[in-house]
Structures are given as structure tokens and as C-alpha cells.
């Protein structure tokens, strides 16, 4: 069972502190796609604690979840309503996260970024609630 946790305030404080200290941040979930792209350095901002499905209305074909929500939890919720994501994200481990799927992207066709409706906080898109269209 997924334990939902809203760590928005704590994450925002960490980001503001990093800005104040001029410290680079590496936003990280399960780190399952760390091998993609070039290595980055900075203080790790772990978003795995910031998890849970915030809103899901199958009739509206929209799901909103926090960045650290495991991708398998999202897919299970959608499957229970006979729905699926509008893409086929790679699973590089059972702990792959919702935020990682969106912000690390997909190298081929079917990028979920094309289906993003909104992000609750434009200045911190990987940390806040991410709203995505789903397919029937």
C-alpha cells in the first residue's frame, strides 16, 4: 500500500536554502535513470518522500500525483479503471517515480511531456503535483 506524504513545504525550504547559499541541486527520485545523460553534481534533493496520488477522476481522464510517487502505483490506479498512460515509459527498476518519468523523459516517441496539462508550481515543476492526461 502506498503511503501518501506531502513534503511540499520541506522541499520548498530546501530549495530556497540552496538558492540563498548558491548551492546547485540535483533533484532525484529513485535514481533509476542516472545512467542517462551526463553526470551532474550538486546537493541531492530527494523527492521519494513526496508521494501519493492527489486527484484521479477516471471520467475526466486526468491524474495528478506527487513527483516521488512510484510509477507502478500510478499504473495500478489507472489499470483499475481500465486506463493507461499515454506513453510506455521504461521501467528501470520497481522504484521508478512519476517525476522521473516526466522530467527525465523518453528518448523515443511517446513522451509523456506531450500530455502534461499543468504543474502546480512552475518554479519547482519536479517537486509539486503533476497533472497528466491518461488514455482509455
Feature locations, PLM:
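Short, well-ordered secondary-structure micro-motifs within conserved domains or adaptor modules
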Residues: 41-46
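Glycine-rich beta-strand-to-loop/alpha-helix junction loops that act as flexible
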Residues: 27-32
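Short, structured beta-strand-loop surface elements
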Residues: 98-100
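Short glycine-biased active-site loop of nucleotidyltransferases that positions the nucleotide triphosphate
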Residues: 34-39
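N-terminal glycine-rich flavin-associated loop
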Residues: 1-25, 48-94, 104-135
Amino acid at each position: 500500500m502506498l503511503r501518501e506524504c506531502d513534503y511540499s513545504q520541506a522541499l520548498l525550504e530546501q530549495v530556497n536554502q540552496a538558492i540563498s547559499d548558491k548551492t546547485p541541486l540535483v533533484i532525484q527520485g529513485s535514481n533509476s535513470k542516472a545512467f542517462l545523460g551526463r553526470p551532474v553534481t550538486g546537493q541531492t534533493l530527494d523527492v521519494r518522500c513526496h508521494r501519493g496520488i492527489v486527484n484521479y477522476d477516471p471520467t475526466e481522464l486526468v491524474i495528478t500525483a506527487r513527483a516521488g510517487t512510484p510509477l507502478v502505483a500510478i499504473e495500478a490506479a489507472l489499470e483499475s479503471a481500465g486506463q493507461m498512460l499515454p506513453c510506455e515509459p521504461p521501467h528501470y527498476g520497481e522504484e521508478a517515480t512519476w517525476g522521473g518519468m516526466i522530467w527525465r523523459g523518453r528518448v523515443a516517441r511517446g513522451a509523456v511531456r506531450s500530455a502534461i496539462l499543468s504543474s502546480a508550481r512552475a518554479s519547482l515543476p519536479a517537486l509539486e503535483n503533476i497533472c497528466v492526461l491518461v488514455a482509455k
